[in-house]
């Protein structure tokens, strides 16, 4: 396992970066955030296909990553949804400035050589 210490340390840094958003951020929510960061302009259908999550799980995570979560709790404000110009009944997703900042921090953590937790 020692051969993999560097890679595992990198994963640890990424997890620590996600934990700055919320200490108990679900993996599904992180996965949805990353999918939107990779492919801005995704629809909920695209996101469900890309992540293999149910439509209910995708919608729950979109709300958590947006302005308002379930039960009117504040969301993380990492993504925003806007009407799709090609089909106005459909919404497409983009990172907010706060989401772009988190994506940049994740990339920085990925490239860092420092041990996790330092």
Question: How would you label these PLM feature ranges?
Answer:
Residues 17-54:
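N-terminal helix-turn-helix DNA-binding core of bacterial DNA-binding proteins
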Residues 76-84:
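Short, basic, alpha-helical segments at the C-terminal edge of helix-turn-helix-like DNA-binding modules
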Residues 66-73:
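C-terminal flanking helix
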Residues 6-22:
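Short, Lys/Arg-enriched N-terminal segment that forms or immediately precedes the first helix
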Residues 61:
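Residues within the DNA-recognition helix of helix-turn-helix
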Residues 14, 97-118:
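Amphipathic alpha-helical dimerization/coiled-coil segments
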Residues 85-103:
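Basic, amphipathic "hinge/linker" alpha-helix immediately C-terminal to the N-terminal HTH DNA-binding motif
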């Amino acid at each position: 396992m020692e051969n993999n210490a560097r890679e595992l340390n990198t994963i640890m840094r990424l997890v620590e970066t996600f934990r700055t958003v919320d200490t108990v951020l679900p993996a599904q929510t992180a996965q949805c955030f990353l999918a939107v960061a990779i492919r801005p302009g995704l629809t909920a259908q695209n996101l469900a296909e890309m992540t293999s999550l149910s439509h209910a799980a995708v919608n729950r995570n979109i709300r958590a990553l947006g302005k308002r979560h379930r039960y009117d709790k504040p969301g993380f404000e990492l993504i925003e949804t806007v009407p799709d110009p090609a089909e106005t009944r459909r919404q497409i997703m983009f990172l907010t400035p706060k989401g772009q900042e988190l994506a940049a921090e994740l990339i920085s953590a990925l490239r860092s050589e420092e041990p996790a937790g330092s």
